[in-house]
């Protein structure tokens, strides 16, 4: 066999191996990016436009409440359309989003008004994604920030532990006013 035929065969073999190598590298990169995306997908997103959703109720937690240190202030609770279905049915479907906006209060001449925003708490219902926490994902955003997250994984579990006694109400404290 002439040498140039062997060289051609070797070049074809090298190209095939490089193709396989490139394919393996591409698969590794794709697997890594899917894995990283999955980790970041566990995070609950900021609920853009939530103040245009249905306002469910307002609650004032005052100094006499044992929850005052952590949750003292004025709470406005908002629900997206799916969550409103859940309030009516007693079980919240996947895609439900509940937001509680916690504001400081201002007192002046016997009138209580809203002060600065302390945080925006968010619950997102996705049964499979958040199976460990009753199907709910939890997050809290600092003040007016849409990116400054307040919860680490342990904090999310702590949120669920607090909501656990509300299991019969699908882990939700608030109810629609009749």
Range-by-range predicted roles:
Residues 7, 78-79, 166-169:
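Intrinsic structural disorder/low-complexity segments
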Residues 33-35:
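N-terminal signal peptide c-region/cleavage motif recognized by signal peptidases
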Residues 22-31:
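Bacterial N-terminal signal peptides
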Residues 39-68, 85, 89-178:
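Sequence context surrounding c-type heme c attachment/ligation sites in exported
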Residues 17-20, 55:
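Charged, compositionally biased non-catalytic regions
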Residues 72-83:
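Short, structured beta-strand/loop micro-motifs enriched in basic residues and often containing a Trp
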């Amino acid at each position: 066999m002439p040498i140039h035929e062997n060289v051609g065969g070797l070049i074809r073999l090298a190209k095939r191996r490089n193709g396989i190598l490139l394919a393996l590298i591409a698969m590794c990169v794709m697997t890594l990016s899917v894995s990283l995306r999955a980790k970041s997908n566990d995070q609950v997103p900021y609920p853009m436009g939530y103040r245009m959703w249905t306002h469910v109720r307002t609650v004032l937690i005052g100094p006499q409440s044992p929850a005052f240190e952590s949750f003292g202030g004025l709470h406005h609770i908002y629900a997206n359309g799916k969550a409103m279905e859940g309030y009516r049915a007693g079980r919240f479907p996947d895609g439900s989003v509940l937001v509680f906006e916690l504001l400081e209060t201002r007192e002046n001449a016997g009138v209580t008004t809203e002060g600065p925003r302390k945080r925006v708490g968010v619950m997102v219902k996705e049964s499979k994604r958040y199976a460990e926490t009753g199907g709910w994902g939890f997050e809290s955003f600092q003040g007016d920030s849409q990116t400054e997250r307040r919860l680490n994984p342990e904090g999310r579990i702590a949120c669920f532990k607090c909501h656990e006694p509300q299991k019969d109400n699908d882990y939700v404290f608030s109810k629609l006013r009749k």
